[in-house]
Amino acid sequence: MKQRGVTVWLTGLSGAGKSTITEALQAKLIAEGYSIEVLDGDIVRTNLTKGLGFSKEDRDENIRRIGFVSNLLTRHGVIVLVSAISPYREIREEVRGKIGNFVEVFVNAPLSVCEDRDVKGLYKRARAGEIKSFTGIDDPYEPPFNPEVECRTDLETLEESVAKVWNKLTELGYIHQAVAV
């Protein structure tokens, strides 16, 4: 199947549901025969961006590197799913401009919901002062102004969130089958 490459960039707070949506979308795309790659922020940090810290400069460099790899894959017709907090609007826009075929998905859940979902205990540690510069606690998260898709994971099911992304990819001509929301 001939497909157009695109980077689907899922951004949001830790615990908002980025990885969950990415995994479900990945399974659906593979089942439909699409060539895809996933760049998960946690995995990228232990490999591609090892050694970077959590200063604004290091976070921006982390996103630039993810964007660079995404751009290479996208140019070769791959659907790239990026799941990364990517807290700063300016660097997300920079990466969007370089990649071109880019769909921003704002995975939106209130901080209180993300803290309730805190399976890794990161928010608890950040509130206790054990983790500094934690996004949403003592470092800002800048929501996108105009994402192509917004998934309110506190108000909708996983299936509804996946359908929103799927339908947007269909509408933009990256995939060829819509799913009812």
Curated annotation (Swiss-Prot):
Catalytic activity: adenosine 5'-phosphosulfate + ATP = 3'-phosphoadenylyl sulfate + ADP + H(+)
Entry superkingdom: Bacteria
Keyword Kinase: yes
Catalytic machinery residues: 86 (phosphoserine intermediate)
Keyword Metal-binding listed: no
Function: Catalyzes the synthesis of activated sulfate.
Gene3D superfamilies the record matches: P-loop containing nucleotide triphosphate hydrolases (3.40.50.300)
A biological-process GO annotation: sulfate assimilation via adenylyl sulfate reduction
Organism name: Microcystis aeruginosa (strain NIES-843 / IAM M-2473)
Keywords, ordered alphabetically: ATP-binding, Kinase, Nucleotide-binding, Phosphoprotein, Transferase
Amino acids binding ATP: 12-19
Similarity-based family: Belongs to the APS kinase family.
The protein's annotated pathway: Sulfur metabolism; hydrogen sulfide biosynthesis; sulfite from sulfate: step 2/3
Name of a matching Pfam family: APS_kinase
Protein name: Adenylyl-sulfate kinase
Cellular component annotations (GO), alphabetically ordered: cytoplasm
EC id: 2.7.1.25
Class in the EC hierarchy, top level: transferase
Bridged cysteine pairs (disulfide): none
GO molecular function per UniProt: adenylylsulfate kinase activity; ATP binding; sulfate adenylyltransferase (ATP) activity
